[in-house]
Amino acid sequence: MPEARAVLELVDQCPRQVLRGAFPVIVIEGLDATGKTTVTQAVAGALQAALLKSPPACISQWRQAFDDEPAIIRRAFYSLGNYIVASEIAQASARSPVVVDRYWHSTAAYAIATEVSGAVQHLPPAHHPVYQWPKDLLKPDLVVLLTVSPEERLRRIRGRGLERTSEEEELEANSVFRQKVEVSYAWMESPGCHVVDASPSRERVLQAVLSLIRDRCPQLP
């Protein structure tokens, strides 16, 4: 698969050990249609922060090809993307705050929900190592998780009419899969996710996120 070779070559170009800069790193997570991308862009603008995303732009052209592959190959693509993003975060955080549109938590939550068959009770228990941040991956200062009710998510998705990944379609069609993703997010540790209700207006959600960031990252101006 030529796309896999290209991704691996990019990973090989990343330094083995990345040292982050002095500025804070904030990750914003959320299921599809929670307003995550819009909020992420607004937060980056308000903080005059660098805006990054996972998977990063340098491999995003191959995302569709990997989304059509079996789960194990798809997960490898997103996992490797996180390590490429970590290298970008390290460089950017030396110059300004960094806001990241998805990172390791989403990769892990979707992987766990996909690999664990059956209902939510079959998930690994809370505090299981699978919910722990990888020791070799650059860690953010704060992870914000945007949430809306299943009914509101469905209304927004159907109103957008945008192309979705197979996993996003699964979220809409399969409430058990969605619940497993949500519980996996809730059980992430070191760092855990700080939940923000994304149901109100965009401006109210933005202010709630900025308030949380300034509370948790006092080094911001």
Each model region followed by its residue ranges:
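Walker A (P-loop) ATP-phosphate-binding motif of ABC ATPase nucleotide-binding domains
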Residues: 25
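Hydrophobic positions on the alpha1 helix immediately C-terminal to the Walker A/P-loop
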Residues: 39
